[in-house]
């Protein structure tokens, strides 16, 4: 188990007046009520399943079939990915892109093909130099004015730029250049290109959640004159099949959550199990990860309860035995806890015990030990924050950051996400993850810094809480906006680290790395315009509605 910190003495006396010391929490109830308790009483009929299988094989043949040129092949693969069905054809797509990578005739390609090729190859880990874009610059080093009229080319360059790594100045310039010109052009474009551009400016492909983006692209793709009817039909059926699976999972989780009765027992805590499921379905939506999705949703639900216990209700003197109990991970510790803490402590242990039982048949119990240790470290870092709040202690920014990165929970979620995966995950995966590799660090920075900016900008943090933005402003004598700009630069730098982590040879298989990429994507989607988890913003409501409530019309 992780080392204990709860025994560290506090230099500030503790008040015995619990009511005075108790933080004040005021979270809104769930907007979903019991809506997801019951799953629609329907299954995909045998005929539709058979059609799905037939279409799948047709699409597979199309992916590997020779095409007149690489542009057509790249565009088709891009559509397969954009419609959210590439998980069926991982090997075929990889093989085709490998061929395109080695048969390079990029000198003849226009801006559209050069950018599309760059993005798809980078997404799959191939080293493609950003120098391929130099031919679109003039002698002064600026992008040629002639490319500004090529809207589809600009759109692809814009999307490609989000795959940039450190030192690729031309792609930093490209984001600004393409954003400006696409914003100017969008009003004069015809549908569906206007919708593609408008949506891209709000959400890039690289940082969007694949299933959310697929739901949107389905509505756009069918209006593209040259769309592939077989691919479109397959993607629609597949979307509905996966949606039904997700609804069944969420119904099961909602029943578990309702039986815990935390809404009554712990009224101080956020009731966000539906939003938690949406978060985790962003980490992995594919059917083969059903078990992992259900386990990780329960973990994020319990982590949310633990967070609110530390942050929104418990006194510091109550948190010491609570942290001790989590560190010791023993149900016997329950007798040492205040009465209101007992249900959440028991539920926490039950979730991990169930996890152990579910993975035991494959001999994967060792994975759960890593997951427990990650949860223990999270609780320990919460206790440090609680001590700072009690003492009204203002740490230096670096001191704050060292503790704040673990409190965002992303290292814990990344490690726990591996528990429900298949044989691609090994003991080496967990050893690697436990050593805080760069890609997990990067997704954690994205989470922490986006959350910090959001909390300060939208005043989502209690006045007595220690704020990273306030720490930075005080230490460096800057305004709030200047602090936001610095934090956002850290986020952009972390995205470059994520992208770097996918370039071959990778430290771990792509499926392992995808968990950190998708965790970062969730933050970009949910937290760009406020805390979309706690306050259930437009992104969360819209995503949950389109992915879990509304099927695609066939």
UniProtKB/Swiss-Prot annotation:
It catalyses: (2E,6E)-farnesyl diphosphate = (1S,8aR)-delta-cadinene + diphosphate. GO terms for biological process: diterpenoid biosynthetic process; response to bacterium. One of its GO terms (molecular function) is sesquiterpene synthase activity. SUPFAM superfamilies: Terpenoid cyclases/Protein prenyltransferases, Terpenoid synthases. Pathway: Secondary metabolite biosynthesis; terpenoid biosynthesis. Mg(2+) 3 binds at residues 451, 455. Residues 1-16 have a biased composition (Low complexity). Its EC number is 4.2.3.13. A motif (DDXXD motif) lies at residues 307-311. Induction: By bacterial infection. Responsible for the cyclization of trans,trans-farnesyl diphosphate (FPP) to (+)-delta cadinene. The Asp-Asp-Xaa-Xaa-Asp/Glu (DDXXD/E) motif is important for the catalytic activity, presumably through binding to Mg(2+). This is (+)-delta-cadinene synthase.
